[in-house]
Amino acid sequence: MKKFSIVVAGGGSTFTPGIVLMLLENLDKFPIRQIKFYDNDAQRQEVIAKACDIIIKEKAPDINFVYTTDPETAFTDIDFVMAHIRVGKYAMREKDEKIPLRHGVLGQETCGPGGISYGMRSIGGVIELVDYMEKYSPNAWMLNYSNPAAIVAEATRRLRPNSKILNICDMPIGIEIRMAEMLGLKSRKDMVIRYFGLNHFGWWTDIRDKKGNDLMPALREKVAKIGYNVEIEGENTEASWNDTFTKARDVFAIDPTTMPNTYLKYYFFPDYVVEHSNPNHTRANEVMEGREKFVFGECRAIAEKGTAKDSKLHVDDHASYIVDLARAIAYDTKERMLLIVENDGAISNFDPTAMVEVPCIVGSNGPEKIVQGKIPQFQKGLMEQQVSVEKLTVEAWMEGSYQKLWQAITLSRTVPSASVAKAILDDLIEANKDFWPVLK
């Protein structure tokens, strides 16, 4: 059985140890001969890499492990790139969240002006990774779960249309794990779903068990009462996420024929979100004080002790979808998965060039979309507005256009007026001068 070589792009990420543990747990399904880390921040990556080196030696000593800041070393002789980069790190995420809040607009990592700001930083970084992969390992595939996935996917469609890149998001998976728990199922894989939308902007339209029984009525009853707020074993859910999962019941009420993605909260209830935000302490601060501190602390402890035996780092079970996706490509498994792909008729009454999130059958040639047919006017109207925000953002990046970025922010449902959009944009330009292209 062939053993694979992978590079994790974003080696210094707080998610990297959990992903490495998940890969090591799945070696029977997806054998690995080599794991490489690549990051452009050597110091940050080193802390994570030293710990992962020990973890790999203890759990799978035959795997060759390399960490580097050199693209040629990282991207030569690989089968898969697993990409989760955050250009500007959490310090810039904090600005993405706090700048809009100063103007009375919600501040969120991937939604509204904050998401647009993050997108403008991410495009260049992801395109650079695609180019390294194609230069040094032209037969490799990139599994990209870098945020904001919608803007990144549109950018790769426009700028690298023939590249072997699969854009995927774990949020629907996280919600499906909760749905399965609510329905008393062993796994989300016991459900067969139909879903359509854009990334962080979609709806489940049909959920059945493997025998074809409709699970939507039972789910509707529960979601109408508690949203998606259920206890998941081994998952430590922070207060801000509990609020999001509970608020899903209000999002659901707007169209009870479907099940919503939780991110719709930011578009339907922006006033509520602003009211419940602390402009001086946002989600970025929560992450820096919580997960970032914990992961880096644990990694330093592993390096000091020389063993990971008592480590509290845990497997990122969520991330097992990455193995499912890699296996689908490697072994032609025809796995059914939600991916972000060019619409091209999957949603018959929607822009064929839009990057939509729909179920696909994935094999060694990539994804084949499952047609979702016509979508209702309500969702279509919302999606046309949102996809225009994403397309204008990518055009603004490509053309260095201030005008188009102002239009993109103005068009976001989260922003009340063009004058507020302009004020936010001017502040974001100042904050991002080391990261964005120059806008004229």
From Swiss-Prot:
CDD domains according to UniProt: GH4_GlvA_pagL_like
Site (Increases basicity of active site Tyr): 109
Assembly and oligomerization: Homodimer.
Family: Belongs to the glycosyl hydrolase 4 family.
Binding residue positions for Mn(2+): 169, 200
Superkingdom, natural source: Bacteria
Function: In vitro, readily hydrolyzes p-nitrophenyl-alpha-D-glucopyranoside 6-phosphate (pNPalphaG6P), a chromogenic analog of the phosphorylated isomers of sucrose. In vivo, is probably involved in the degradation of the 6-phosphate derivatives of the sucrose isomers trehalulose, turanose, maltulose and palatinose, catalyzing their hydrolysis into glucose 6-phosphate (G6P) and fructose, which allows the bacterium to use these sugars as energy sources for growth. Is not able to hydrolyze the C2 or C4 chromogenic stereomers (i.e.
Name this protein carries in UniProt: 6-phospho-alpha-glucosidase
Primary gene name: pagL
Cofactors that this protein relies on: NAD(+); Mn(2+)
Binding annotation for NAD(+): 4-70
Residues annotated as catalytic: 170 (proton donor), 263 (proton acceptor)
Alphabetized InterPro entries for the sequence: GlycHydrolase_4_CS (IPR019802), Glyco_hydro_4 (IPR001088), Glyco_hydro_4_C (IPR022616), Lactate_DH/Glyco_Ohase_4_C (IPR015955), NAD(P)-bd_dom_sf (IPR036291)
Residues holding substrate: 93, 147, 283
Keywords: Carbohydrate metabolism, Glycosidase, Hydrolase, Manganese, Metal-binding, NAD
EC number: 3.2.1.-
An annotated Gene Ontology molecular function: oxidoreductase activity, acting on the CH-OH group of donors, NAD or NADP as acceptor
Activity across pH: Optimum pH is 6.9-7.3.
Pfam families in UniProt: Glyco_hydro_4, Glyco_hydro_4C
Organism: Leptotrichia buccalis (strain ATCC 14201 / DSM 1135 / JCM 12969 / NCTC 10249 / C-1013-b)
Pathway membership, UniProt: Glycan degradation; palatinose degradation
Hydrolase listed as a keyword: yes
Induction, per UniProt: Induced by growth on the sucrose isomers trehalulose, turanose, maltulose and palatinose.
Cofactor binding remark: Binds 1 NAD(+) per subunit. Binds 1 Mn(2+) ion per subunit.
Example of a GO biological process term: carbohydrate metabolic process
